[in-house]
Amino acid sequence: MPKRIAVLVTNNFDDQEYLEPVEALRAAQHTICNIELRAGKVVYGLHGGLAVTIDRSIEQISIDDFDALLIPGGESPLALAHDVRVLHFIQAFNQARKTIFSLCDASLLLSEADVLKNRMITSIRAHALRVQYAGATYYDAELVNDNNQLISSRVPNDLPIFIHECLNVLKS
C-alpha cells in the first residue's frame, strides 16, 4: 500500500541525499510532499543543479497527513534547526511513533528537536558526540534501524542500503 512521505528540505540540501531516496520512493508508488517554511518556494541543492518546489508549508500540514518523514543532509537541516515550528513538527512526528528517515547532517536537526534520547542512530563521525550528548547511542555503521521508527545513514555512499531499508520499512 502506498505511503505518504514528507520531505523536510530547504536551500543547500545534499542533492544526492534528496534525489536518490525520492526517486526510489516515487518508483515504489509512494507520495512525496516537500515541506518547508513557505509553500511554492523553490529551494536548491548544494551543487546548484537540483531545484525543488515546496509543496506545502510547515503550517499547512499535520503529522496525520504523513506516514514517514525524510530529512536529507547537507546544510538544509541546520538552516531549519532554528525554527520552532520545524522542531515542534519533528517532536510530534516522533511522539506519534511515525518513521523518520535521517541522512548525514539530519542528525543535527533531530538533536536540536530533542528526539534522540534513548535512541540508536548513525550519522557522519563528526556528529557522533553531538548525538550522544542528545542522549542517543551512536553507531559508526552504514545503516541503523531503531525499531522501524528512526532509520539513519551516514553519507551518500550509504544510500543503496539506506534506500533498501526505507522501502522495506514502508512495506511493514
Predicted regions and their residues:
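Extended, subdomain-level signal for the structured scaffold at the beginning of enzyme domains
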Residues: M1-I100, L108-M120, A128-S172
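Catalytic nucleophile serine of serine hydrolases
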Residues: C104
